[in-house]
Regions:
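Periplasmic/cell-envelope proteins involved in peptidoglycan metabolism and beta-lactam response
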Residues: 1-83, 95-99, 153-160
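Short, solvent-exposed alpha-helical surface patches in non-cytosolic proteins
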Residues: 4, 8, 84, 132, ...
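Short glycine/serine- and small hydrophobic-enriched flexible loop segments
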Residues: 10, 87-94, 148, 187-194
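Short linear capping/connector segments at secondary-structure termini
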Residues: 24-28, 105, 169-175
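Conserved catalytic neighborhood of penicillin-recognizing serine enzymes
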Residues: 49, 95-155, 170, 194
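Glycine- and acidic
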Residues: 64-72, 140, 167-173
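Proteins synthesized as precursors that undergo proteolytic processing into mature forms
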Residues: 90, 97-98, 162-167
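Active-site-proximal helix/loop microenvironment
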Residues: 161-195
Length: 195
């Protein structure tokens, strides 16, 4: 599995580098000993039962960069956090996947902060939809409403329990607007496979 993960990561990133218009340095022209500026990535695979690492690739070439992106690269979590927002609401409120949630525009602020009007990625709003659709289609406005239903403190506590660390006390967390590592996200996701 380790060799496959290494090969797959390099293959996918090489494909991206070969796209027309790709303007950044490429691994194929990198000179050893110089700063590593070419496209990087990370892969981690865990055994859901034991948490054992099955494969881990911290970058494209350890010889060029010893920085392990699996453990050390903090990136915005984004929509990968939405399953935890929904899981919290399912557990704490009894929300069911078939329960309808509004996907219309929303305006909100938190603790007297500025008003925020998030959009859906496709720029549309679809009215009442089953909550499962909100998760499956990653609808931002529905995810915020589901997060509010479950409660920001409950979502933050779940995130702490799953070792996401400190996350903002703001509704932006419902959309994953905070940073953590690939290892943290992968470890947290294993709860869905074991429940």
């Amino acid at each position: 599995l380790q060799a496959s993960a290494e090969k797959s990561l390099d293959s996918h990133l090489t494909k991206i580098e070969s796209r027309p218009g790709f303007q950044h340095p490429k691994k194929s022209v990198h000179q050893r000993g110089k700063a590593t500026r070419y496209l990087q990535g990370a892969v981690v695979s865990l055994d859901n039962s034991s948490g054992a690492i099955l494969a881990m690739v911290g970058g494209r070439s350890f010889g060029d960069s010893a920085f392990n992106r699996v453990y050390r690269a903090r990136r915005q979590v984004g929509s990968t956090f939405k399953p935890f927002v929904y899981a919290n609401a399912f557990e704490t409120t009894g929300l069911l996947p078939g329960a309808y949630v509004n996907d219309d525009p929303i305006r909100l602020s938190h603790n007297g902060g500025p008003v925020w009007s998030p959009q859906n990625s496709d720029g549309t709003f679809t009215g009442l939809q089953p909550s499962a659709i909100g998760l499956i289609r990653s609808r931002n406005t529905m995810s915020i409403r589901v997060g509010q239903l479950g409660g920001i403190n409950n979502v933050r506590e779940l995130a702490r329990t799953l070792k996401f660390g400190e996350i903002p006390d703001s509704p932006v967390i419902y959309l994953g607007a905070f940073e953590t590592t690939p290892m943290t996200v992968t470890s947290a996701m294993s709860i869905f496979a074991t429940k």
